[in-house]
Structure formats: C-alpha cells, structure tokens
Amino acid sequence: MAQLNIKGRLAGDVTILDMDGRITIGEGSVALRGAIRRLLEEGKKKILLNLAGVGYIDSSGIGELVSSYTAINKDGGQLKLLSLTQKLQDLLTITKLLTVFDSYDNEADALSNFK
C-alpha cells in the first residue's frame, strides 16, 4: 500500500474516484493532482473522493485535498469526500478542515447532495 491507486467511475454526472493507498508527499499527492486535473480538463465538475481505502495521509496529502477543492470550486464544480477513516476524520477535525469539506458515510447520501 505504498503508492496511491485511483480508479474512476461514473454515477450519473458525478465522477467517483475510488482511492487505495497513501496520499503522501511525492507519488500519492502527484497522482491525486493529476487525476483531478484530467477530470477538470474533461469538463467533469462533480467529483466524489472515496477515501475508504486510504490508510495514511500526510500534510502534503492534506494540502493536495485543499488544492483540489479550491481548483474544483474555482471552476464552478463541487468536491465531496466519502468514507473517511476514523484517522482521517480526526485529522480533518484537528485541522478544522472537516468544516470545509462535505463528507458522507455512504455513497447514496453523497450522490444525492450534489447540485
């Protein structure tokens, strides 16, 4: 689980990125940045990050989440988070970022909250 694997799938007009691995400085954050950039270039503006398989995220990974959120919002889109692990939820709470991101425990709830 050293690298970050990202698989994309569609649910209506929402792109879901199922992530497995670590979002860390270097490969993980670069993979996330590249995936988000490609989606925006394709005109996809509703993005749901499924973080159930993310075992670890460092400060660079947190920065990449914030950067992705900012880029998507600036482009008129929405970024939401799905299936936060307890560790990630605690980290986002401590950094006060849990108030910035919309996060959901199940996919159906997340999908129904896209506008």
Segments the model singles out, each with a brief description of its role:
Residues 23-101:
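Amphipathic alpha-helical interaction surfaces in cytosolic regulatory modules
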Residues 102-106:
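Short acidic-hydrophobic, aromatic-tinged amphipathic segments that line or gate anion-handling sites
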Residues 114-115:
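A short, charged, amphipathic alpha-helix used as a generic interaction element across diverse proteins
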